[in-house]
């Protein structure tokens, strides 16, 4: 069994990005600038945004964190997004999800300038991705592709089963694995909460990408020998024996599934670090595109 080490791979990518930024500095060029916008004070979201800002600093990017209270109206948020759209100093920005219930998430995503949408959630970018055009790929699917590529996992002609159909992971992943090229050229089955007899489908899979958010959902009996397992799930499970009071648990019963898998991602240390690394890569791409366009 080969462990798909997202932590190490993400660090390799960050080192490559740092080298690019150092070249920019040496040439007197502007370095990439990522802004992160968060509404409210959700602990997990604040931690995640904080890690993105810290990652920017470590690779030499400029970063801006915009915090808005949970009582922020949709009108106020859209105004702030338009300000970020028009700020030439900022190359890309993200709006941390989920948003408070008074705000229409779809309207927010539609308002982001597609050329600054480094999360890849704008319908224009999503459509370009579906048509195999150059665009920003959502960071988590982008990270999974990068892991598969760097570890040389064969995808051509393989049966890939994606569990979960969110627009953040499941749906883009199903599109990307079916596209021409590597990683891709896979036959894809997209499953979800209404899929019947899911174990019959997963046991036929060469590659399983689980993005369900249900701890230890994927059991060993649902997996065939030699399958490649990508675990996108990150759930805080209460654990009184842990000093934090919880443990981070994936969708996959790692202990038992890893005995059958040919390749598997751990949780934590698998897909999570890759997501942040690819957000940085998208921001670097945004800076390069803006340089060309200007």
From Swiss-Prot:
Report residues binding NADP(+): 164-166, 193, 234
Q: Which reaction does it catalyse?
A: (6R)-5,10-methylene-5,6,7,8-tetrahydrofolate + NADP(+) = (6R)-5,10-methenyltetrahydrofolate + NADPH; (6R)-5,10-methenyltetrahydrofolate + H2O = (6R)-10-formyltetrahydrofolate + H(+)
Q: Transferase as a keyword? A: no
Under InterPro entries, the record lists: Aminoacid_DH-like_N_sf, NAD(P)-bd_dom_sf, THF_DH/CycHdrlase, THF_DH/CycHdrlase_cat_dom, THF_DH/CycHdrlase_CS, THF_DH/CycHdrlase_NAD-bd_dom
Q: Does the keyword DNA damage apply?
A: no
Matching entries from Pfam families are given as:
THF_DHG_CYH (PF00763), THF_DHG_CYH_C (PF02882)
Q: Which GO terms describe its cellular component?
A: cytosol
Q: How does it assemble?
A: Homodimer.
- Function of the molecule: Catalyzes the oxidation of 5,10-methylenetetrahydrofolate to 5,10-methenyltetrahydrofolate and then the hydrolysis of 5,10-methenyltetrahydrofolate to 10-formyltetrahydrofolate.
The molecule here is called Bifunctional protein FolD
């Amino acid at each position: 069994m080969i462990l798909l080490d997202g932590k190490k791979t993400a660090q390799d990518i960050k080192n490559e990005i740092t080298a690019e930024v150092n070249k920019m500095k040496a040439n007197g060029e502007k370095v990439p600038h990522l802004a992160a916008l968060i509404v409210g004070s959700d602990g997990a979201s604040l931690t995640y945004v904080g890690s993105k800002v810290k990652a920017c600093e470590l690779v030499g990017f400029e970063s801006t964190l915009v915090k808005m209270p949970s009582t922020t109206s949709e009108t106020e948020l859209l105004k702030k997004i338009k300000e970020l759209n028009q700020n030439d100093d900022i190359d890309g920005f993200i709006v941390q999800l989920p948003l408070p219930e008074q705000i229409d998430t779809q309207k927010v995503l539609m308002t982001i300038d597609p050329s600054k949408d480094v999360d890849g959630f704008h319908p224009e970018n999503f459509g370009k991705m579906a048509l195999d055009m150059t665009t920003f790929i959502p960071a988590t699917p982008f990270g999974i592709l990068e892991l598969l590529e760097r570890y040389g996992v064969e995808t051509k002609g393989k049966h890939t089963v994606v569990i979960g159909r969110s627009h953040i992971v499941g749906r883009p992943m199903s599109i990307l694995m079916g596209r021409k090229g590597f990683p891709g050229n896979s036959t894809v089955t997209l499953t979800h909460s209404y899929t019947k007899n899911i174990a019959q489908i997963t046991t036929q899979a060469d590659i399983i990408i689980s993005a369900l958010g249900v701890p230890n959902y994927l059991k060993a009996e649902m997996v065939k020998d030699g399958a490649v397992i990508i675990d996108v799930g990150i759930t805080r499970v209460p654990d009184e024996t842990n000093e934090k009071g919880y443990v981070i648990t994936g969708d996959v019963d790692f202990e038992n599934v890893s005995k059958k898998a040919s390749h598997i991602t751990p949780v934590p240390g698998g897909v999570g670090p890759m997501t942040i690394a690819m957000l940085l890569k998208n921001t670097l791409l945004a800076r390069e595109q803006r340089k060309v366009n200007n």
